[in-house]
Amino acid sequence: MEKLKEIEKESIFPKGEEKLLTEKGHPYRERNKGIIALLITTIIWSLAFIAQSTAMDQIGPCAFVFYRHLLSGLCLLPFAFLKPCSSEEKRAGIKGGALTGIVLGLASVIQQFGVKETTVGKAAFLTVLYIILIPIFGLIIGKKPEKKIWFCAILALVGVYFIAIKAGTKFTIGRGDMYIILCSLLYAIQIMQVGHYVKKVNISWYMSIQFLAGSMVGLLGFLFFEKFSFMSLKAAFLPIAYAGIMSGAVAFTMQSYAQKRLEDTLASLLMSTTAIYAAIWGWLFLGESLGIREIFGCIIMTIAVVYAQLPEKQRKRS
């Protein structure tokens, strides 16, 4: 009987991932809960691109980032006070959250400028580039990536070419596309910061301060380059509320819940589907369309993103 349980465990989780099993509940049931939670999370994130795009008709990019991250931070801040932690963990969480939040704020502002000048589908797919960029940045700081990463990086660039470069034109990229690519670079840095701090700090303080710091970046741009309008804020209330509460506070919490129950490879694969959902929502709700050339680029880029996350052992077995 014990042997059968071990076989069942190994069939669900790769070797070394048994710790993902919870103390209570059937492993299949817990794993399915994680899959469902992460699929819902990716849908929430993908719909945020719609919120970002529609909000631009009412308020400026910096104002949207300020309101969005401020709302996310305020939603999570009570949990920081409720969860007990040492003063050292609290200080580390605040410091790490502030540093990460600055990068998050810059990435969010630049992304908003990009969304304003390109389609939702393009913005989502180009943002996914951070999954390829993270291992490359790792090489710069001394973490040698697998050889397949270089192949995936080149393949992703080919995909970007077909998505962003119009047929019959010289090698030029639209301004909106450049904003999104720069945004993906910053998101790659932000994700690496999260990986550095997450095991060393109090998560509740870290996440709430990260959002609040990000909102301050948006506030600076808002004060210097944009004008406040109560009517514009009122008109953009729903997109701001969705991005701040659902995409920020709720989705990040669901991601944490899901990744406690899933192996990292599966979780990453599920999260990469955000771009696909975003393209669908742009077509359904905003009347956007992707031409054959751009769809081909999206397919190539999806292959690169997915292949980059498959472990060597899994590919050899297949």
Each language-model region and where it sits:
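Transmembrane alpha-helices of multi-pass small-molecule transport proteins
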Residues: 2, 12-16, 21, 56-106, ...
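Glycine-/small-residue-enriched transmembrane alpha-helix faces in small-molecule transporters
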Residues: 2-63, 102, 106, 110, ...
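C-terminal-most transmembrane helix of multi-pass membrane proteins
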Residues: 2-3, 8, 14-15, 19-23, ...
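Hydrophobic alpha-helical transmembrane segments of multi-pass integral membrane proteins
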Residues: 32-37, 63-78, 95, 148-155, ...
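Specific transmembrane alpha-helical segments of multi-pass solute transporters/efflux pumps
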Residues: 44, 48-49, 77-127, 162, ...
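Helix-helix packing/entry segments at the starts of transmembrane helices
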Residues: 67, 109, 123-129, 194-215, ...
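C-terminal transmembrane-helix exit sites in multi-pass transporters
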Residues: 75, 80-84, 130-151, 276-295
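Hydrophobic transmembrane alpha-helices of multi-pass small-molecule transport proteins
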Residues: 76, 145-165, 184, 218, ...
